[in-house]
Structures are given as C-alpha cells and as structure tokens.
C-alpha cells in the first residue's frame, strides 16, 4: 500500500473531518438528529441545554437503556406536545 492511500495517525488527528465534524472548532452547536438531546417535537435542532456539551452519538451503536420519562415537577395535567398541535 502506498503512503498516499492511507492517513497516518497524526494526519487523522489534524483532519477537519475527524469524528464527523465539519471543522474542529465545533463547540455546542446544533447537531440535529445526531445530538443526544434531539427530539423530533421538543428539540428538532438538537441544541444542548445551557451548561451541557453537545455530543453526537453513533447511530449504529447507541441504544437507549430505558424509555425516557419527562419530569413535570409533580404537575399531572400538562398535556404532552404532539405534531398535530403545532401552529402553521
């Protein structure tokens, strides 16, 4: 295999496409469906909450361990949003 057919470890670290990022200065930007904070109704942009780092998950290996239950601080009468309730 010639040297031009593969990248060395140091080339891979400096590559702007490492870990699927477009550039290395990605901080807490929107990751859409790739974000661990993504929800199609509540957070379609995949933005991280204040104080948390946005990390993309590997869609082929990531598995939720349990169903996510929203915390409503004891309020039982708050209806969950649905796509039918969205305003045009």
From Swiss-Prot:
This protein's major location comes to cytoplasm
UniProt entry tagged with the keyword Transferase: no
Record localization:
Cytoplasm
Q: How far does the signal peptide extend, from start to end residue?
A: none
Alphabetically list the UniProt keywords: Cytoplasm
**Where is region (Disordered) located?**
1-23
Source organism superkingdom:
Eukaryota
Gene Ontology annotations for the cellular component aspect, listed alphabetically: cytoplasm
State the family it belongs to: Belongs to the AIM4 family.
Output this protein's name. Answer: Altered inheritance of mitochondria protein 4
The source organism is Lachancea thermotolerans (strain ATCC 56472 / CBS 6340 / NRRL Y-8284)
Taxonomic classification: Eukaryota, Fungi, Dikarya, Ascomycota, Saccharomycotina
**Name of encoding gene:** AIM4
């Amino acid at each position: 295999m010639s040297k031009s057919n593969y990248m060395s470890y140091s080339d891979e670290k400096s590559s702007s496409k490492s870990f699927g990022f477009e550039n290395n200065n990605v901080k807490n930007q929107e990751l859409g469906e790739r974000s661990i904070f993504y929800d199609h109704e509540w957070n379609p942009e995949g933005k991280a909450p204040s104080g948390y780092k946005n990390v993309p998950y590997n869609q082929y290996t990531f598995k939720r361990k349990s169903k996510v239950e929203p915390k409503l601080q004891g309020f039982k009468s708050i209806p969950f949003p649905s796509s039918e309730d969205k305003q045009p």
